[in-house]
Amino acid sequence: MGRNGANHSIQTVSEYEPIGEDEERTPLLPQGVQTRGSSFMSSAFNLMNAIMGSGILGLSYAMANTGTVGFSILLLMVASLAAYSIHLLLLLCDKTGINSYEALGEKALNRPGKILVACTILIQNIGAMSSYLFILKTELPAAIIGFMRSDSETSGKWFENGVTLLILVTVIIVLPLALLPKIGFLGYTSSIAFLFMLFFTVVVVVKKWSIPCPLPINSTLSLSLNTSECTAQLFVISSKSAYAVPTMAFSFLCHTAVFPIYCELHRPTKRRMQRATNVSIFLSFVVYLISALFGYLTFYSHVGSELLLAYNTYLPRDILVMSVRLAILLAVLLTVPLIHFPARKAVLMLCRGEREFSWLSHTLSCFFILTLVLLLAIFVPDIKNVFGVVGSTTSTCLLFVYPGMFFLRISSEPIRSFNSVGAVFLLVIGLVVGVLSLSVIIVSWVQGP
Protein backbone atom coordinates (compact mmCIF):
# COMPACT_ATOMS: atom_id res chain seq x y z
CA MET A 1 0.00 0.00 0.00
CA GLY A 2 1.37 3.41 -0.89
CA ARG A 3 1.79 5.83 2.02
CA ASN A 4 3.08 8.85 0.14
CA GLY A 5 0.09 11.13 0.63
CA ALA A 6 -2.29 12.53 3.13
CA ASN A 7 -5.17 10.25 2.20
CA HIS A 8 -3.90 6.82 3.14
CA SER A 9 -5.68 3.87 1.60
CA ILE A 10 -6.98 1.15 3.88
CA GLN A 11 -6.14 -2.48 3.46
CA THR A 12 -9.04 -4.79 2.89
CA VAL A 13 -9.82 -6.40 6.21
CA SER A 14 -10.36 -9.82 4.70
CA GLU A 15 -6.78 -9.78 3.40
CA TYR A 16 -5.25 -8.88 6.74
CA GLU A 17 -4.00 -11.45 9.18
CA PRO A 18 -3.96 -10.01 12.71
CA ILE A 19 -0.86 -10.41 14.78
CA GLY A 20 -0.83 -12.04 18.16
CA GLU A 21 -0.75 -9.99 21.32
CA ASP A 22 2.73 -11.33 22.06
CA GLU A 23 4.09 -9.99 18.78
CA GLU A 24 3.74 -6.27 19.37
CA ARG A 25 6.96 -5.54 17.51
CA THR A 26 5.41 -6.74 14.24
CA PRO A 27 4.45 -3.81 11.99
CA LEU A 28 0.74 -3.07 12.26
CA LEU A 29 0.45 -1.33 8.92
CA PRO A 30 0.20 -3.29 5.67
CA GLN A 31 3.45 -3.71 3.80
CA GLY A 32 3.92 -1.74 0.60
CA VAL A 33 6.18 0.97 -0.77
CA GLN A 34 8.87 1.41 1.87
CA THR A 35 9.80 5.00 2.71
CA ARG A 36 11.33 6.19 5.94
CA GLY A 37 8.60 7.57 8.15
CA SER A 38 8.61 10.09 10.96
CA SER A 39 10.99 9.59 13.86
CA PHE A 40 9.78 8.59 17.30
CA MET A 41 10.49 12.05 18.77
CA SER A 42 8.82 13.83 15.85
CA SER A 43 5.68 11.75 16.40
CA ALA A 44 5.79 12.40 20.14
CA PHE A 45 6.14 16.17 19.61
CA ASN A 46 3.20 16.15 17.18
CA LEU A 47 1.05 14.34 19.73
CA MET A 48 2.06 16.78 22.47
CA ASN A 49 1.18 19.70 20.20
CA ALA A 50 -2.21 18.11 19.53
CA ILE A 51 -2.75 17.69 23.28
CA MET A 52 -1.65 21.08 24.59
CA GLY A 53 -3.35 24.29 23.57
CA SER A 54 -4.74 27.44 25.12
CA GLY A 55 -6.61 25.29 27.66
CA ILE A 56 -3.44 25.21 29.77
CA LEU A 57 -4.28 28.77 30.86
CA GLY A 58 -7.42 27.57 32.64
CA LEU A 59 -5.93 24.70 34.64
CA SER A 60 -4.92 26.84 37.63
CA TYR A 61 -8.54 27.95 37.89
CA ALA A 62 -9.58 24.30 37.75
CA MET A 63 -7.17 23.53 40.61
CA ALA A 64 -8.59 26.40 42.66
CA ASN A 65 -12.05 24.84 42.30
CA THR A 66 -11.03 21.23 43.02
CA GLY A 67 -8.06 21.54 45.40
CA THR A 68 -4.45 20.57 44.86
CA VAL A 69 -4.94 16.89 45.69
CA GLY A 70 -8.35 16.69 44.02
CA PHE A 71 -6.99 18.28 40.85
CA SER A 72 -3.95 15.97 40.79
CA ILE A 73 -6.13 12.87 41.15
CA LEU A 74 -8.54 14.01 38.43
CA LEU A 75 -5.72 14.97 36.08
CA LEU A 76 -4.03 11.59 36.58
CA MET A 77 -7.33 9.80 35.93
CA VAL A 78 -7.95 11.73 32.72
CA ALA A 79 -4.40 11.12 31.48
CA SER A 80 -4.72 7.40 32.21
CA LEU A 81 -8.10 7.17 30.47
CA ALA A 82 -6.75 9.01 27.42
CA ALA A 83 -3.79 6.62 27.17
CA TYR A 84 -6.09 3.63 27.65
CA SER A 85 -8.58 4.75 25.00
CA ILE A 86 -5.71 5.13 22.51
CA HIS A 87 -4.54 1.66 23.57
CA LEU A 88 -7.96 0.27 22.61
CA LEU A 89 -7.85 2.02 19.23
CA LEU A 90 -4.37 0.64 18.50
CA LEU A 91 -5.53 -2.80 19.62
CA LEU A 92 -8.32 -2.63 17.04
CA CYS A 93 -5.75 -1.67 14.40
CA ASP A 94 -3.81 -4.76 15.45
CA LYS A 95 -6.86 -6.98 15.07
CA THR A 96 -8.23 -5.58 11.80
CA GLY A 97 -5.38 -3.98 9.87
CA ILE A 98 -7.35 -0.73 9.70
CA ASN A 99 -5.36 2.48 10.07
CA SER A 100 -7.89 5.31 10.32
CA TYR A 101 -10.53 6.41 12.80
CA GLU A 102 -13.13 6.69 10.04
CA ALA A 103 -12.49 3.14 8.83
CA LEU A 104 -12.89 1.81 12.37
CA GLY A 105 -16.28 3.51 12.44
CA GLU A 106 -17.15 1.79 9.17
CA LYS A 107 -16.01 -1.58 10.53
CA ALA A 108 -18.11 -1.13 13.66
CA LEU A 109 -21.25 0.52 12.24
CA ASN A 110 -20.90 0.09 8.45
CA ARG A 111 -20.98 3.19 6.23
CA PRO A 112 -23.04 5.32 8.68
CA GLY A 113 -20.25 4.78 11.20
CA LYS A 114 -17.66 6.08 8.76
CA ILE A 115 -19.73 9.18 8.03
CA LEU A 116 -20.42 9.70 11.73
CA VAL A 117 -16.74 9.61 12.71
CA ALA A 118 -15.65 11.80 9.78
CA CYS A 119 -18.30 14.41 10.61
CA THR A 120 -17.36 14.30 14.30
CA ILE A 121 -13.70 14.91 13.46
CA LEU A 122 -14.64 17.74 11.09
CA ILE A 123 -16.87 19.49 13.62
CA GLN A 124 -14.36 19.05 16.45
CA ASN A 125 -11.31 20.24 14.52
CA ILE A 126 -13.04 23.06 12.64
CA GLY A 127 -14.40 24.28 15.96
CA ALA A 128 -10.97 24.07 17.57
CA MET A 129 -9.25 25.85 14.67
CA SER A 130 -11.89 28.60 14.63
CA SER A 131 -11.55 29.10 18.38
CA TYR A 132 -7.75 29.27 18.13
CA LEU A 133 -7.89 31.79 15.31
CA PHE A 134 -10.45 33.81 17.26
CA ILE A 135 -8.03 33.90 20.21
CA LEU A 136 -5.28 35.12 17.89
CA LYS A 137 -7.56 37.80 16.43
CA THR A 138 -8.43 39.19 19.86
CA GLU A 139 -5.16 38.69 21.76
CA LEU A 140 -2.33 39.09 19.23
CA PRO A 141 -2.67 42.88 18.72
CA ALA A 142 -2.56 43.48 22.48
CA ALA A 143 0.44 41.16 22.84
CA ILE A 144 2.36 43.13 20.21
CA ILE A 145 1.30 46.53 21.54
CA GLY A 146 2.49 45.50 25.01
CA PHE A 147 6.09 45.65 23.80
CA MET A 148 5.71 49.27 22.66
CA ARG A 149 6.91 52.01 24.98
CA SER A 150 3.79 54.16 24.88
CA ASP A 151 0.31 54.26 23.41
CA SER A 152 1.33 57.10 21.08
CA GLU A 153 3.75 54.75 19.29
CA THR A 154 0.92 52.37 18.39
CA SER A 155 -1.87 54.80 17.57
CA GLY A 156 -3.30 53.99 14.16
CA LYS A 157 -0.78 51.25 13.39
CA TRP A 158 -1.82 48.37 11.13
CA PHE A 159 -1.04 45.71 13.74
CA GLU A 160 -3.76 47.10 16.00
CA ASN A 161 -6.29 45.48 13.67
CA GLY A 162 -6.88 41.89 14.76
CA VAL A 163 -8.47 40.86 11.46
CA THR A 164 -5.49 42.12 9.46
CA LEU A 165 -3.05 40.28 11.72
CA LEU A 166 -5.14 37.11 11.57
CA ILE A 167 -5.23 37.07 7.76
CA LEU A 168 -1.49 37.71 7.58
CA VAL A 169 -0.46 34.92 9.97
CA THR A 170 -2.91 32.53 8.31
CA VAL A 171 -1.53 33.17 4.82
CA ILE A 172 2.15 33.40 5.81
CA ILE A 173 2.39 30.69 8.49
CA VAL A 174 -0.68 28.45 8.68
CA LEU A 175 -1.32 27.93 4.96
CA PRO A 176 2.20 26.75 3.98
CA LEU A 177 2.29 24.34 6.94
CA ALA A 178 -1.23 23.08 6.24
CA LEU A 179 -0.33 22.36 2.60
CA LEU A 180 2.38 19.88 3.61
CA PRO A 181 1.37 16.37 2.46
CA LYS A 182 2.64 14.58 5.57
CA ILE A 183 1.92 15.33 9.18
CA GLY A 184 5.43 14.18 10.08
CA PHE A 185 6.83 17.39 8.57
CA LEU A 186 5.14 19.30 11.38
CA GLY A 187 7.35 17.64 13.98
CA TYR A 188 9.74 20.61 13.87
CA THR A 189 7.05 23.22 14.48
CA SER A 190 5.48 21.00 17.14
CA SER A 191 8.78 20.87 19.01
CA ILE A 192 8.89 24.68 18.93
CA ALA A 193 5.32 24.84 20.25
CA PHE A 194 6.27 22.48 23.09
CA LEU A 195 9.25 24.70 23.97
CA PHE A 196 6.85 27.65 24.18
CA MET A 197 4.72 25.67 26.64
CA LEU A 198 7.84 24.84 28.68
CA PHE A 199 8.75 28.53 28.67
CA PHE A 200 5.27 29.34 29.97
CA THR A 201 5.67 26.78 32.77
CA VAL A 202 9.10 28.10 33.78
CA VAL A 203 7.80 31.68 33.92
CA VAL A 204 4.82 30.61 36.06
CA VAL A 205 7.22 28.92 38.49
CA VAL A 206 9.62 31.89 38.61
CA LYS A 207 6.88 34.49 39.05
CA LYS A 208 5.54 32.66 42.11
CA TRP A 209 8.12 34.62 44.13
CA SER A 210 7.51 37.95 42.35
CA ILE A 211 3.97 38.45 43.64
CA PRO A 212 3.47 38.80 47.42
CA CYS A 213 0.87 36.95 49.39
CA PRO A 214 -1.55 38.23 50.60
CA LEU A 215 -2.11 39.83 47.22
CA PRO A 216 -1.95 43.62 46.79
CA ILE A 217 -5.42 45.16 46.96
CA ASN A 218 -4.65 48.25 44.88
CA SER A 219 -2.14 49.76 42.50
CA THR A 220 0.01 51.09 45.39
CA LEU A 221 0.78 47.47 46.34
CA SER A 222 -0.62 47.78 49.85
CA LEU A 223 -1.19 44.27 51.14
CA SER A 224 -4.40 42.59 52.15
CA LEU A 225 -4.40 41.56 55.83
CA ASN A 226 -6.21 38.27 55.22
CA THR A 227 -3.30 35.83 55.48
CA SER A 228 -5.69 32.85 55.42
CA GLU A 229 -5.95 33.43 51.68
CA CYS A 230 -2.38 32.13 51.35
CA THR A 231 -3.27 28.58 52.36
CA ALA A 232 -3.66 25.99 49.63
CA GLN A 233 -6.80 23.86 49.77
CA LEU A 234 -6.26 20.12 49.34
CA PHE A 235 -9.85 19.35 48.34
CA VAL A 236 -12.56 21.76 47.20
CA ILE A 237 -16.14 20.78 46.41
CA SER A 238 -18.48 23.51 45.23
CA SER A 239 -20.75 24.40 42.34
CA LYS A 240 -17.69 25.73 40.51
CA SER A 241 -16.05 22.30 40.71
CA ALA A 242 -18.40 21.17 37.96
CA TYR A 243 -16.87 23.80 35.68
CA ALA A 244 -13.40 22.36 36.23
CA VAL A 245 -14.21 18.79 35.20
CA PRO A 246 -14.88 19.46 31.48
CA THR A 247 -11.72 21.60 31.25
CA MET A 248 -9.66 18.73 32.59
CA ALA A 249 -11.53 15.99 30.74
CA PHE A 250 -10.61 17.41 27.34
CA SER A 251 -7.04 18.38 28.29
CA PHE A 252 -5.61 15.19 26.76
CA LEU A 253 -7.67 15.00 23.56
CA CYS A 254 -5.34 14.08 20.69
CA HIS A 255 -7.24 11.16 19.20
CA THR A 256 -7.95 12.75 15.82
CA ALA A 257 -4.20 13.10 15.24
CA VAL A 258 -3.22 9.63 16.48
CA PHE A 259 -3.97 7.76 13.26
CA PRO A 260 -2.27 10.19 10.82
CA ILE A 261 0.79 10.27 13.08
CA TYR A 262 0.75 6.49 13.46
CA CYS A 263 0.49 5.98 9.69
CA GLU A 264 3.73 7.90 9.15
CA LEU A 265 5.69 6.56 12.13
CA HIS A 266 8.97 4.91 11.19
CA ARG A 267 8.65 1.15 11.88
CA PRO A 268 4.99 1.49 13.01
CA THR A 269 4.21 -1.14 15.63
CA LYS A 270 1.66 -1.10 18.41
CA ARG A 271 4.38 -1.02 21.07
CA ARG A 272 6.24 1.83 19.36
CA MET A 273 3.11 3.94 18.85
CA GLN A 274 1.91 3.27 22.39
CA ARG A 275 5.30 4.38 23.70
CA ALA A 276 5.06 7.62 21.71
CA THR A 277 1.57 8.15 23.13
CA ASN A 278 2.65 7.44 26.70
CA VAL A 279 5.66 9.78 26.43
CA SER A 280 3.46 12.56 25.02
CA ILE A 281 0.76 12.18 27.65
CA PHE A 282 3.30 11.92 30.49
CA LEU A 283 5.21 15.07 29.46
CA SER A 284 1.93 16.94 28.93
CA PHE A 285 0.78 15.77 32.37
CA VAL A 286 3.97 17.10 33.99
CA VAL A 287 3.70 20.48 32.24
CA TYR A 288 0.00 20.73 33.12
CA LEU A 289 0.54 19.84 36.78
CA ILE A 290 3.51 22.16 37.39
CA SER A 291 1.96 25.17 35.62
CA ALA A 292 -1.42 24.66 37.31
CA LEU A 293 0.14 24.17 40.76
CA PHE A 294 2.40 27.23 40.70
CA GLY A 295 -0.27 29.36 39.04
CA TYR A 296 -2.64 28.43 41.86
CA LEU A 297 0.00 28.93 44.59
CA THR A 298 0.62 32.43 43.21
CA PHE A 299 -2.97 33.69 43.31
CA TYR A 300 -4.80 31.03 45.33
CA SER A 301 -8.56 31.65 45.28
CA HIS A 302 -8.05 34.85 43.26
CA VAL A 303 -6.83 33.01 40.17
CA GLY A 304 -9.04 33.59 37.14
CA SER A 305 -10.10 31.37 34.27
CA GLU A 306 -7.32 32.95 32.16
CA LEU A 307 -4.08 32.83 34.14
CA LEU A 308 -2.09 35.44 32.21
CA LEU A 309 -4.69 38.14 32.89
CA ALA A 310 -3.93 37.83 36.60
CA TYR A 311 -0.25 38.52 35.95
CA ASN A 312 -1.16 41.59 33.91
CA THR A 313 -3.04 42.94 36.93
CA TYR A 314 -0.19 42.61 39.43
CA LEU A 315 2.84 42.78 37.11
CA PRO A 316 1.92 45.31 34.41
CA ARG A 317 4.39 45.58 31.53
CA ASP A 318 6.58 42.80 32.94
CA ILE A 319 8.81 41.69 30.07
CA LEU A 320 8.68 37.99 30.97
CA VAL A 321 4.89 37.99 31.25
CA MET A 322 4.54 39.82 27.93
CA SER A 323 6.97 37.40 26.30
CA VAL A 324 5.17 34.32 27.58
CA ARG A 325 1.85 35.76 26.43
CA LEU A 326 3.23 36.05 22.91
CA ALA A 327 4.79 32.57 23.19
CA ILE A 328 1.43 30.99 24.08
CA LEU A 329 -0.20 32.70 21.10
CA LEU A 330 2.55 31.39 18.80
CA ALA A 331 2.09 27.89 20.25
CA VAL A 332 -1.64 28.13 19.52
CA LEU A 333 -0.84 29.33 16.01
CA LEU A 334 1.45 26.33 15.37
CA THR A 335 -1.27 23.95 16.60
CA VAL A 336 -3.70 25.01 13.86
CA PRO A 337 -1.90 23.24 10.95
CA LEU A 338 -1.66 20.06 13.03
CA ILE A 339 -5.37 19.82 13.80
CA HIS A 340 -6.11 20.90 10.23
CA PHE A 341 -4.54 17.66 8.97
CA PRO A 342 -7.17 15.21 10.38
CA ALA A 343 -9.96 17.56 9.26
CA ARG A 344 -8.64 17.59 5.69
CA LYS A 345 -8.21 13.82 5.80
CA ALA A 346 -11.85 13.44 6.89
CA VAL A 347 -13.03 15.67 4.02
CA LEU A 348 -11.02 13.68 1.49
CA MET A 349 -12.30 10.38 2.85
CA LEU A 350 -15.91 11.58 2.64
CA CYS A 351 -15.52 13.02 -0.86
CA ARG A 352 -13.00 10.71 -2.51
CA GLY A 353 -13.08 7.54 -0.48
CA GLU A 354 -9.88 5.51 -0.73
CA ARG A 355 -8.54 6.84 -4.01
CA GLU A 356 -4.88 7.61 -4.58
CA PHE A 357 -3.40 10.85 -3.31
CA SER A 358 -4.11 13.87 -5.52
CA TRP A 359 -2.41 17.24 -5.12
CA LEU A 360 -5.46 18.97 -6.61
CA SER A 361 -7.87 17.48 -4.07
CA HIS A 362 -5.33 18.01 -1.31
CA THR A 363 -4.93 21.72 -2.14
CA LEU A 364 -8.62 22.42 -2.73
CA SER A 365 -9.67 20.81 0.55
CA CYS A 366 -6.93 22.71 2.37
CA PHE A 367 -8.09 26.07 0.99
CA PHE A 368 -11.74 25.22 1.68
CA ILE A 369 -11.17 24.34 5.34
CA LEU A 370 -8.86 27.28 6.07
CA THR A 371 -11.22 29.73 4.36
CA LEU A 372 -14.13 28.37 6.38
CA VAL A 373 -12.39 28.60 9.76
CA LEU A 374 -11.02 32.05 8.90
CA LEU A 375 -14.51 33.34 8.06
CA LEU A 376 -15.91 31.82 11.26
CA ALA A 377 -13.18 33.42 13.38
CA ILE A 378 -13.68 36.84 11.76
CA PHE A 379 -17.46 37.11 11.44
CA VAL A 380 -18.89 35.01 14.29
CA PRO A 381 -18.32 37.02 17.49
CA ASP A 382 -19.38 34.24 19.86
CA ILE A 383 -17.67 31.41 18.00
CA LYS A 384 -16.27 29.96 21.24
CA ASN A 385 -19.77 29.69 22.70
CA VAL A 386 -21.24 28.24 19.50
CA PHE A 387 -18.64 25.49 19.36
CA GLY A 388 -18.68 25.06 23.12
CA VAL A 389 -21.80 22.90 23.00
CA VAL A 390 -20.86 21.02 19.85
CA GLY A 391 -17.23 20.71 20.90
CA SER A 392 -18.09 19.23 24.28
CA THR A 393 -20.17 16.57 22.53
CA THR A 394 -17.67 15.70 19.80
CA SER A 395 -14.73 15.71 22.22
CA THR A 396 -16.55 13.30 24.52
CA CYS A 397 -17.28 10.99 21.60
CA LEU A 398 -13.72 10.99 20.24
CA LEU A 399 -12.05 10.64 23.64
CA PHE A 400 -14.34 8.21 25.45
CA VAL A 401 -17.43 7.00 23.59
CA TYR A 402 -16.10 5.90 20.20
CA PRO A 403 -13.05 3.95 21.46
CA GLY A 404 -15.21 2.04 23.94
CA MET A 405 -18.11 1.47 21.54
CA PHE A 406 -15.92 0.42 18.61
CA PHE A 407 -13.97 -2.02 20.75
CA LEU A 408 -17.17 -3.66 21.99
CA ARG A 409 -18.51 -3.89 18.43
CA ILE A 410 -15.36 -5.14 16.70
CA SER A 411 -13.44 -7.14 19.29
CA SER A 412 -14.23 -10.79 19.93
CA GLU A 413 -12.99 -10.66 23.53
CA PRO A 414 -15.42 -11.88 26.23
CA ILE A 415 -17.51 -9.16 27.82
CA ARG A 416 -15.90 -9.88 31.19
CA SER A 417 -12.36 -9.48 29.89
CA PHE A 418 -10.28 -6.57 31.18
CA ASN A 419 -10.40 -4.62 27.91
CA SER A 420 -14.15 -5.13 27.46
CA VAL A 421 -14.86 -3.93 31.00
CA GLY A 422 -12.55 -0.98 30.35
CA ALA A 423 -14.45 -0.18 27.14
CA VAL A 424 -17.75 -0.17 29.04
CA PHE A 425 -16.18 2.11 31.67
CA LEU A 426 -15.06 4.53 28.93
CA LEU A 427 -18.61 4.62 27.57
CA VAL A 428 -20.06 5.43 30.99
CA ILE A 429 -17.41 8.10 31.68
CA GLY A 430 -18.10 9.61 28.25
CA LEU A 431 -21.81 9.91 28.94
CA VAL A 432 -21.23 11.45 32.38
CA VAL A 433 -18.66 13.98 31.13
CA GLY A 434 -20.79 14.84 28.08
CA VAL A 435 -23.90 15.53 30.16
CA LEU A 436 -21.89 17.50 32.73
CA SER A 437 -20.20 19.61 30.04
CA LEU A 438 -23.50 20.47 28.35
CA SER A 439 -25.06 21.30 31.72
CA VAL A 440 -22.20 23.63 32.63
CA ILE A 441 -22.42 25.46 29.30
CA ILE A 442 -26.21 25.84 29.51
CA VAL A 443 -26.00 27.15 33.08
CA SER A 444 -23.32 29.64 31.98
CA TRP A 445 -25.59 30.89 29.20
CA VAL A 446 -28.57 31.24 31.55
CA GLN A 447 -26.57 33.12 34.18
CA GLY A 448 -25.03 35.39 31.56
CA PRO A 449 -21.74 37.27 31.85
Swiss-Prot record:
Subcellular location per the Swiss-Prot or TrEMBL entry: Cell membrane
- The intrachain disulfides are 213-230
- The main location is membrane
Q: Which GO terms describe its cellular component?
A: plasma membrane
Q: Which residues are glycosylated?
A: 7, 218, 226, 278
- Cross-referenced InterPro entries: AA_transpt_TM
A Pfam family found in this protein is Aa_trans
| General function of this protein | Probable sodium-dependent amino acid/proton antiporter, could be a neuronal transporter for glutamate.
Protein name, as recorded: Probable sodium-coupled neutral amino acid transporter 6
Native organism is: Danio rerio
